[in-house]
Amino acid sequence: MKTLIARHKAGEHIGICSVCSAHPLVIEAALAFDRNSTRKVLIEATSNQVNQFGGYTGMTPADFREFVFTIADKVGFARERIILGGDHLGPNCWQQENADAAMEKSVELVKAYVRAGFSKIHLDASMSCAGDPIPLAPETVAERAAVLCFAAESVATDCQREQLSYVIGTEVPVPGGEASAIQSVHITHVEDAANTLRTHQKAFIARGLTEALTRVIAIVVQPGVEFDHSNIIHYQPQEAQALAQWIENTRMVYEAHSTDYQTRTAYWELVRDHFAILKVGPALTFALREAIFALAQIEQELIAPENRSGCLAVIEEVMLDEPQYWKKYYRTGFNDSLLDIRYSLSDRIRYYWPHSRIKNSVETMMVNLEGVDIPLGMISQYLPKQFERIQSGELSAIPHQLIMDKIYDVLRAYRYGCAE
């Protein structure tokens, strides 16, 4: 990360896409996409996904590292080209507890990530805990971030410190996307970004972390990009020019969250304006969902009724029976809920792919389709971009490859924007 940031600060148009997903097919796609390039791949886990207690994936940071490395070995991607990051590391998972208890767990969380070899650490202490004022004072956020940084430094080896980098910032979107419809977003004021940096510098120095400050590579701000279930707030470069100019006088770049669904031109403009770390998550699993839904429609027409997976019906039934991952995010009417379950840009389906019933139905669908020749006309109907690549000889009409290429479409836009 430090080398890439140095190249950007030296004037090169270069950025990096941060893949924020724990889905094995998304991780496989991210690694396979860059297998034959010289680029490194940044893969991040969030604190609610992966933590010392397992998170909702059931994985600790060490488990997640091995999970990613196993996929890398399968793909033939060198492990040393992978950068592992920890996102929203702080009290996010324990906001219902008092600050002392939440921070105690947060300290152990950060230590677990660093011990597991994660080298990009987002110190996110921006959320209020039980009994805290809402919002927290910037000084409190910075002081708690310094506590987390001290924890990271205390367990990092000398070798790790050479690679270790930190991201700070208080204007952080809700992990997992917005819960309600949005029409506009508040772009961070330069004064607030400067205050974030100033308060963190003061808090770090007070804890004897002057050297660690040199490892702070980025600050999270809101450049004016966001999405909800059916709306996308597109990047307007002219609105972020003050931010773009201010960061040029620092050693840092910006990290932009929720960049999913922007245009490839917007990614290029974001990187030009020093938002050099572009985080993406739901757009990748949304592309995965699109591919699976398309293949399910193809299966419906090609496979005898008694042998079909019933994949779409299984997904719908499981999500309606177990609504905990979407209920507070989606609309309440039955028909509206079904539309959101299937097609929402916030893609809450991503939490359900590991469910045994859904996983088994998808596997059945894949086996069914691997045993037949899919007519080109059907691929043109349901996966038109993939049809074009099959026609040009770039792609084969194999279900797994079709899914990979659908995810590649998202990564292609980021590659254009990051322009290495």
Swiss-Prot record:
Q: Which Gene3D superfamilies match?
A: Aldolase class I, putative tagatose 6-phosphate kinase domain like
Q: Which InterPro entries match?
A: Aldolase_TIM (IPR013785), GatZ/KbaZ-like (IPR012062), GatZ_KbaZ_carbometab (IPR050303), TagBP_ald_GatZ (IPR023436)
Which lineage is the organism of this entry classified under, starting from the top rank?
A: Bacteria, Pseudomonadati, Pseudomonadota, Gammaproteobacteria, Enterobacterales
Which keywords, in A-to-Z order, does the entry hold?
Answer: Galactitol metabolism
Biological process (GO), any one: D-tagatose 6-phosphate catabolic process
Q: In which pathway does it act?
A: Carbohydrate metabolism; D-tagatose 6-phosphate degradation; D-glyceraldehyde 3-phosphate and glycerone phosphate from D-tagatose 6-phosphate: step 2/2
Q: Which HAMAP family does the protein's record reference?
A: Tagatose_aldol_GatZ (MF_01296)
Q: Which family does it belong to?
A: Belongs to the GatZ/KbaZ family. GatZ subfamily.
| Cellular component, GO, one term | plasma membrane
Q: Does the keyword Hydrolase apply?
A: no
Q: Which SUPFAM superfamilies match?
A: Aldolase
Q: Could you give the subunit structure recorded for this chain?
A: Forms a complex with GatY.
Enumerate the NCBIfam families for this protein. Answer: agaZ_gatZ, PRK15052.1
Q: What does this protein do?
A: Component of the tagatose-1,6-bisphosphate aldolase GatYZ that is required for full activity and stability of the Y subunit. Could have a chaperone-like function for the proper and stable folding of GatY. When expressed alone, GatZ does not show any aldolase activity. Is involved in the catabolism of galactitol.
Q: Which organism is it from?
A: Shigella boydii serotype 18 (strain CDC 3083-94 / BS512)
Q: What protein name applies here? A: D-tagatose-1,6-bisphosphate aldolase subunit GatZ
The gene it comes from is gatZ
